[in-house]
């Protein structure tokens, strides 16, 4: 869980901006999108191999 400490004279907007940046760096949103729907293990393997193939031929 990402958390920040808001400074004494810090505005709410800047604290929110820091929190969003920290969440993005931690990969929270990408993890949520990845886990939004269940994916069968066979589908995961297929996607992984297709991604590897794309990287190889790029």
UniProtKB/Swiss-Prot annotation:
UniProt lists compositionally biased (Basic residues) regions at: 43-58
Q: What InterPro entries has UniProt attached to this entry?
A: Ribosomal_bS21, Ribosomal_bS21_CS, Ribosomal_bS21_sf
A Pfam short name: Ribosomal_S21
Quote the PROSITE patterns the UniProt record gives: RIBOSOMAL_S21
- Please provide the Gene Ontology terms (biological process) for this protein: translation
Sorted alphabetically, the keyword list is: Ribonucleoprotein, Ribosomal protein
Q: Which domain of life is it from?
A: Bacteria
A single MF term (Gene Ontology) = structural constituent of ribosome
| Residues in coiled coil | none
* Gene Ontology cellular-component terms listed: ribonucleoprotein complex; ribosome
The segments labelled Disordered in the record are 34-58
**Family from the record:** Belongs to the bacterial ribosomal protein bS21 family.
Q: What is this protein called?
A: Small ribosomal subunit protein bS21
What is the native source organism of this protein? Clostridium acetobutylicum (strain ATCC 824 / DSM 792 / JCM 1419 / IAM 19013 / LMG 5710 / NBRC 13948 / NRRL B-527 / VKM B-1787 / 2291 / W)
Question: Taxonomy-wise, where does this protein's organism fall, top ranks first?
Answer: Bacteria, Bacillati, Bacillota, Clostridia, Eubacteriales
